[in-house]
Amino acid sequence: MMPRKEAKRIDIALQGGGAHGAFTWGVLDRLLDDDRLEIVGVSGTSAGAMNATALIQGLASGGRAAAQALLRDFWSQVSAAARLSPIQRTFFDMLAGRWSLDLSPSFVVSQQLQRMFSPYQLNLLDINPLRDIVAAFYDFDIVNRAEDHKLFLSATNVRTGLPKVFRQPEISADALMASACLPFLFRAVEIDGEAYWDGGYMGNPPLFPLIDETDVRDTVIIQINPFERRELPKTAYEIENRLNEITFNASLIKELRAAYFLAEIIRHEGLEREAYRDARLHRIEAQQEMRKFSVSSKLNAEWPFLEHLH
């Protein structure tokens, strides 16, 4: 009988993307099914931060099955809350099998209002249904005490414009909300006197905390936003959508380039591996599939759509 091989230790970096984060949930489900892999460190941004925190909490509290159950529970709660949203698909979109919200009158109106008013003017009560889910769903004591797993969540410091990476033991509901704070929809999240917006602007997802602060060489990036689109955007809305994708991929491209140059320096200069580790980066994506969905579908958390992405 052949001796069983030791599990391959990996880090995982999870990109943000609203409801499209259900794609990441599906990938994580399959990685957790594979006992040849051992997840050590996880980083995440926005929806990726939500997935990452559920993953770490589940692994720390009950192992792989618990992590899978928590991820499903989180997305089911998001979907249930979304049923109360005024922004829904039109009847014609449902008939045509389109997941986009582009034709939804309430979505169109909300887009126009966001161009004229800030959330400080429109959302006077600072209502955010996701905040209630996050506060009730996660057990941050378990997350922050997870000794065998490291967690890194990114946000953008509004004042300095620099990335902020939250680590254990500072993971909290506010840290998660900061990582997912889209400034056109919600007020900045304030933590210890600093204001934060969505981490996607500066680290989507953050790679170097995993490279620097874990002893794992292999990092798996789960990418949501497509790098490429074949069609040239021509309408104002198409241009805005493409700019959204480019913006939220820019930080990932920069970190990938930096990791490549670091690896080249290590190979050519003969630096000690103890000081500089030659990271191996892997990417899981579904660009052909994700290109089919407009940016507005990131706000569509209907359960059939989430299951389709999963």
Task: Please provide the spans of the model-predicted regions.
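Patatin-like phospholipase
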Residues: 1-43, 53-310
